[in-house]
A protein has these predicted regions:
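Conserved P-loop NTP-binding catalytic core
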Residues: 1-57
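Short, low-complexity Ser/Thr-rich regulatory SLiMs
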Residues: 48, 64-68, 206, 317-320
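Switch/communication elements of ASCE P-loop NTPase nucleotide-binding domains
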Residues: 1-9, 216-357
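Short, ordered beta-strand-loop transition motifs
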Residues: 31-38, 205-213, 319-320
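Electropositive, glycine-dotted interaction segments
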Residues: 50-202
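Extended helical coiled-coil dimerization/tether regions that scaffold
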Residues: 162-235, 355-362, 366, 371-378
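Short acidic, glycine-rich loop/turn motifs
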Residues: 44-53, 83-85, 219-225, 318-320
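Residue-level recognition of well-ordered beta-strand positions that form the cores
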Residues: 43-47, 61-65, 82, 218, ...
Length: 378
């Protein structure tokens, strides 16, 4: 959804800026087990403010026809698009277009909209393109470039999605950098030292042949007191490098009140470091801008009532035959009955006896027995 909103259409993108290939090649999104095309639905609700007098709860829905899995030649089209602000519907786009309550964003409307409401609505209907979002095209151009910018800026700067965090690399650029100089960022370096780096410090070095700064481990030679830098991926652990790459995004989320969505959050990073980050998000004295952290994990250690409320813990159960995934919360089980979930229970032990679902028995023994049998027969 983020990639679609930022480019303003449901066509494929030539720019592979995300490690998630489905963000650029939308034919990868539909369920690969479906024989016929089914609508793909996206929905998001978030809060944004523009000064003390303009605070908004923004709800956006998008329903699209992308064809079947890997169907590149399918004629794609937008089936529905809805924008609501503070509970009021601003527009609804289906086969037709309804412009509804614009008063909720009256301070953001263009002058031409207020003066020529009827004619502007007709122009907007005629501007619809089945592959282009009305939000970032007709609505932006005709009704409110300022409010559209508010939404797009939120998607750009405050909705941070890290796909495949295990392979993430942070690219640093500096204005007018000096070649071979070492740039040490104090906050990141202090966090890295708490995490447990093997060197004296970590910093970024710009080489002669590459514009992007690379992460280096910094040492002081105890004999001659000179500073030496070695590429961090040679000296530091995989988990340390992952932590250093991710930590600036945690800082950005806290500073902006953004949403940080992380795939494979716990890969190669010590659970105590991750729990400290989680506790920072829960700390109202530190998280004054109400930033959010959303992550997936295979590690049941996070099934902990001291870390998360029951409604904050979600499970995903995938059907082996249909490949459909069902998302549900721990709080959906209620607090009574055989499967009721009470505060301060041992969620992890209950999960391992399949009380909450989203777990399957895996036994590789038959595979190895077959290998041994083949070796004996050979």
């Amino acid at each position: 959804l983020r990639a679609i909103v930022l480019r303003g259409n449901i066509r494929n993108s030539e720019e592979k800026s995300s490690p998630n290939p489905a963000a650029a090649a939308l034919e990868l999104i539909p369920n690969n087990n479906e024989m016929e095309s089914k609508p793909v639905c996206f929905e998001i609700e978030f809060y944004e403010e523009d000064g003390e007098d303009h605070k908004f709860k923004i709800h956006y829905e998008l329903e699209v026809d992308l064809g079947t899995f890997l169907e590149e030649e399918h004629q794609r089209k937008i089936l529905a698009e809805v924008l609501e602000v503070n509970g009021e519907r601003v527009f609804e786009r289906t086969q037709d277009l309804k412009i509804e309550n614009l008063k909720v964003i009256k301070d953001y409307l263009s002058d031409i909209t207020e003066q020529n409401a009827d004619s502007v609505n007709e122009i907007a209907k005629n501007s619809l393109n089945q592959e282009e979002l009305f939000l970032t095209n007709g609505f932006k151009l005709i009704f409110s470039p300022k409010f559209t910018k508010l939404i797009v800026d939120w998607f750009t700067n405050k909705f941070m999605v890290i796909y495949r965090a295990d392979s993430m690399q942070l690219i640093k650029r500096f204005a007018d950098p000096k070649k071979k100089a070492i740039y040490v960022e104090k906050t990141t370096d202090e966090a890295a030292k708490l995490f447990g780096i093997n060197s004296n410090a970590v910093g970024y070095v710009v080489s002669d042949d590459e514009p992007d700064a690379k992460l280096y481990s910094v040492f002081k030679n105890m004999k001659n007191k000179k500073t030496t830098a070695v590429a961090a991926d040679i000296f530091e652990s995989y988990g340390t490098i992952r932590f250093i790459n991710m930590f600036p995004l945690v800082i950005k989320a806290m500073q902006t009140g953004g949403i940080l969505v992380v795939d494979e959050f716990d890969a190669s990073i010590h659970p105590m470091a991750l729990m400290s980050i989680i506790n920072v998000f829960h700390n109202d004295d530190v998280n004054i801008h109400h930033a959010q952290l959303i992550f997936n994990t295979h590690n049941p250690i996070f099934l902990n009532s001291n870390l998360f409320r029951r409604d904050e813990i979600k499970f995903v159960e995938r059907g082996d035959d249909t490949h459909d995934s069902v998302l549900y919360a721990l709080s959906d089980f209620g607090t009574t009955g055989d499967k009721g979930v009470r505060k301060h229970e041992d969620y992890m032990s209950k999960y391992f006896i399949s009380q909450y679902g989203a777990i399957k028995d895996i036994d590789f023994t038959p595979i190895f027995e077959e290998i041994l049998c083949d070796e004996k027969e050979g």
